[in-house]
Amino acid sequence: MRLIDSTAKISPLAVVEEGAQIGAHVEIGPFSVIGKNVKIGAKTVIHSHVVINGHTEIGEQNQIFQFASIGEINQDLKYQGEPTKVIIGDRNRIRENVTIHRGTVQGGGVTRIGNDNLFMINTHIAHDCSIGNRCIIANNGTLAGHVTLDDFVIVGGMSAIHQFVVIGSHVMLGGGSMVSQDVPPYVMAQGNHAQPFGVNLEGLKRRGFDKPAMHAIRNAYKLIYRSGKTIEEAIPEIEQFAVNEPAVQLFLDFFKRSTRGIIR
């Protein structure tokens, strides 16, 4: 049985399989295909020629544009058809030709996306990725499996991020970057392979960081990247002023949880 709210607007040329759950005021355009295990929240708009498959849960007020593919079988050769998931939050904009693949058992079983993100044309989000809130991935950005983007990350166009890499909050990656190691919060980076070149001060201003916080973040950045010290030598000094500055504590904690190493 299809569970379709009476207020949903579904084109007669769309295919909604038995079992799909469609919320209030959802719109589904012509030639879109919604699989039997899909749940779509209220006021989400699905334009024409979109395919949503697998055990996929989509929240409210999302916009999904033409030729996007969500919840399809992932490209991990170990995948054996297990009922893994894609879970997407609210108010995301998923533009044309975006692909978001379902998770794997080995990676926790879920590809997870938060709220208020923008994925521009041709973005690829592979299995088991975890994306926070208010991130932007520009045209042709590619995330390999198990990549994590914390909140407020911007990924420049034509960039690629290696599997298992973690990108910290408020990071700005320049266009065409190839990222193979973790990028700490607040950092701007670019290149092949990506290298740090400063603190994302403009982004921090836009998000309401005050001058003392930004000054402390810059000092922490300089200790890591410009003092000539190793990370192990710099961390005790950063700990001294992280006590009174939560923004620096976030920076410090990132180094302690990194498993792939930090870009230098």
UniProtKB/Swiss-Prot annotation:
| This protein's pathway | Glycolipid biosynthesis; lipid IV(A) biosynthesis; lipid IV(A) from (3R)-3-hydroxytetradecanoyl-[acyl-carrier-protein] and UDP-N-acetyl-alpha-D-glucosamine: step 1/6
Its quaternary organisation is:
Homotrimer.
**What's the main place this protein lives?**
cytoplasm
Domain of life of the organism in this record? Answer: Bacteria
Task: State the family named in the UniProt similarity comment for this chain.
Answer: Belongs to the transferase hexapeptide repeat family. LpxA subfamily.
Is Lipid metabolism included in the keywords of this UniProt record? yes
A Gene Ontology cellular component where this protein is annotated is:
membrane
- Give GO BP annotations, semicolon-separated: lipid A biosynthetic process
Gene3D superfamilies reported in the protein's UniProt record = Hexapeptide repeat proteins (2.160.10.10), Udp N-acetylglucosamine O-acyltransferase, C-terminal domain (1.20.1180.10)
Name the reaction it catalyses: a (3R)-hydroxyacyl-[ACP] + UDP-N-acetyl-alpha-D-glucosamine = a UDP-3-O-[(3R)-3-hydroxyacyl]-N-acetyl-alpha-D-glucosamine + holo-[ACP]
Note the InterPro entries from the entry.
Acetyltransf_C, Acetyltransf_C_sf, Hexapep, Hexapep_transf_CS, Lipid_A_LpxA, Trimer_LpxA-like_sf
Cellular localisation = Cytoplasm
Gene name for this UniProt entry: lpxA
Q: What are the protein's UniProt keywords?
A: Acyltransferase, Cytoplasm, Lipid A biosynthesis, Lipid biosynthesis, Lipid metabolism, Repeat, Transferase
A GO molecular-function annotation:
acyl-[acyl-carrier-protein]-UDP-N-acetylglucosamine O-acyltransferase activity
Query: What EC number(s) would the UniProt record show?
Result: 2.3.1.129
Q: What does this protein do?
A: Involved in the biosynthesis of lipid A, a phosphorylated glycolipid that anchors the lipopolysaccharide to the outer membrane of the cell.
Cite the Pfam families for this sequence: Acetyltransf_11, Hexapep
> What is the protein named?
Acyl-[acyl-carrier-protein]--UDP-N-acetylglucosamine O-acyltransferase
